[in-house]
Amino acid sequence: MPRWAVFAGVTALVLILLLALARASQLTVDGSVSSAVGADSHQPTDHRSHDGSMDPGSNGGATESIESSTAQFDAPTRPGALSPGALLANVALSQGLFAIVLLAGAWYAEIPPAALGVSAAPLSTGPPALGVGIAMGLGLYLVNELGTLGANAAGIETPDALRELLTPDSRSGWLILLVGVLPTIAVFEELLFRAALIGALAAGFPISPWLLAALSSIAFALGHGAQGTVGMVATGGLGFVLAGTFVVTGSLLVVVVAHYLVNALEFVVHEGLGVEFALGD
């Protein structure tokens, strides 16, 4: 017989620890960015416009191509900045450990897999679920890009310091990021914020899954404090869309795939390929 209260306690513990770690990470990122800015102030300025091209008055004057941006794979770490490898290892280990704790709690409390969004239904674990997840991921990424463009056009800064700090400085680092770290993040965060906080609690207690979706999205935003206020608002909105998708489909796989694609595309497009979109003047 499922012990819902036990699993709810484990979930609450993991959430509290995650939020505490997120707060500590926010302070670390803020310090690292400040150090990096201080170091950059002593370096020659690379004048670039917001669309990624060189300003005509700067040395070089030519537009930066997508191919040339691959040089950043081997770019050295800036003085005072945390090592991308150390940051990636910290993220993977901490979130991987939290995922193991949640899964162990679900096993101990005898939580049925269906309550966590895992069943034999095609829309849960079959090819249809994979297809829906891919479509959702691509759609959310496009919406995110359009939102960023709109915010920038309105003069609202959209911070990307955390993404830059996590960007690998080698090809092997990119492989680890895309194959190891980002999948771990997607699996853990969807397991916690969608499967546990919505699926399991709605199955075990008389609580509306839509109310749980709203509350879990707030917690999801708070867990991304290192992205700044604007980033938290955007993440909260993304979290609610993923939560709604989980409620409608009942599939953990769908939201994991969508979550992974949003993160992976942001890294590959902006940091890997060096592409920056901008509205026409």
Task: Give the ranges of each region predicted by the language model.
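N-terminal, membrane-interfacial amphipathic/helix-forming hydrophobic leader that caps
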Residues: M1-G131, Y141, F267-D281
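Alpha-helical transmembrane segments of integral membrane proteins
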Residues: P2-V10, A86-S94, P127-M136, G173-L177, ...
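Juxtamembrane helix-loop-helix connectors linking adjacent transmembrane helices
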Residues: W107-I185, I198, A203
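Generic detector of intrinsically disordered, low-complexity, polar/charged segments
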Residues: S49, M54-S58, A114, L130, ...
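Generic structural marker for isolated residues within well-ordered, non-membrane alpha-helices
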Residues: V101-L102, G147, I198, L242
